[in-house]
Amino acid sequence: EEMAASMNMSGGAAWSKLQSYLTSTVKVDYQGKQITLSEVRNLAYSPETSVRKSAYETEIAAYEKVEDAIAFSLNYIKNQVTMLSEKRGYASPLAMTLEQSRMKRETLDAMMAAIDEYLPVFRKYLRKKGGMLGHVNGLPWYDLFAPLGKADKTYSIEEAKQYLIDTFTKLTPEMADLMREAFENEWIDFYPRKGKEGGAFCAGAMWLKQSRILTNYDGYFGSVDTLAHELGHAFHNRQIENHAPLNQDYPMPVAETASTFNEVHLGKAARAEASGEELLNLLENDIKEQTQCIVDIYSRYLFETAVFEQSQNKFLMADDLKQIMLDAQKKTYGDGLDPECMHPYMWVCKGHYYSEGLSFYNFPYAFGNLFALGLYSQFEKE
């Protein structure tokens, strides 16, 4: 284990850093100027169809510049994980991840079976949305995040802060106090910039009894929702910061519970104050988020499973990985998406695939989401 940890610094960890570096620095040419990958991906939420479509095409073109190098990263990280799981006596990388997650295989299989059973419901929603936007062959990928209803309201950082504090004071003052502390003590890196990673995450600094949060804030409700999610992680950190160091670790399925609970509460509070086009937007946004947490997460799980299996027999070139991703999307999204406009490069931009220490960084989101929905339902009853 000591040797594996030492060699990892120039092995899996180095390949992971390469993926992060390339996706955060790749030059994205959009309408005559260069922007970051995070900025062009944020345009998927634009209310303008032409903007969403051109941003999607620009994003796809940008990946072509880095696809081969990142394919090397993915292959060698997965090869290292497979080798170490065998040396440690696990039947597979998934078996090792399940032990890390403190989850039984039967639990995972039951959840995936339930997800598979409900895929037709999500596909019906996607086809309906596609029809509302004028499409006849399913929803094209560039309209997957298209807002419906009125979606032009934006929040400054100060407005987002006050909105979150007011909303969560009604849930628990302890959560609201932590949110105020995070904003006022500058725990949050808000805006996208050159060289910054996409997406969002929260890291605990337990020795300081603080957390640090990264987002790519654009001012829309979705970004406020992301802040609520990440601050949920910070709240989880606050609950365990006084525990002994060996008791501060927790499995990924549980890690997504407080964060998703926050999203559920914020969404319900926002919908209670809305009506008409604004309510339509919030309702559709909630279904859209559930689609990501269930359908897209399932596609990521299928993709990673196939990559682990196939990478043991051959090196997977970028074209191989693109085909595996398309196959996974077709199995999950089905006829809900336009088969001529999917996203073969979703393996390039998602850093979750490139963790050498935690594989299958996908199904915990589905579990945390479903668990949090159940907890919130119980909370309302009580």
Residue ranges: model-predicted function:
Residues 128-176, 180, 184, 202, ...:
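Long, K/E/R/D-enriched contiguous segments that form extended
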Residues 1-106, 110, 114-117, 163-175, ...:
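His/Asp/Glu-rich acidic catalytic environments and adjacent acidic regulatory segments
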Residues 215, 222, 230, 245-252:
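Conserved binding/catalytic microenvironments
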Residues 152-157, 206-228:
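Short pre-active-site segment immediately N-terminal to the catalytic Zn-binding motif
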Residues 153-155, 188-210:
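Catalytic zinc-binding patch centered on the HExxH motif and its immediate surroundings
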Residues 1, 27, 102, 131, ...:
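C-terminal, non-catalytic "cap/extension" segments appended to globular domains
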Residues 251-278, 285-292, 368:
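Post-HExxH zinc-binding segment in Zn-dependent metallohydrolases
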Residues 89, 218-240, 259, 264, ...:
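Active-site recognition of the HExxH zinc-binding catalytic motif
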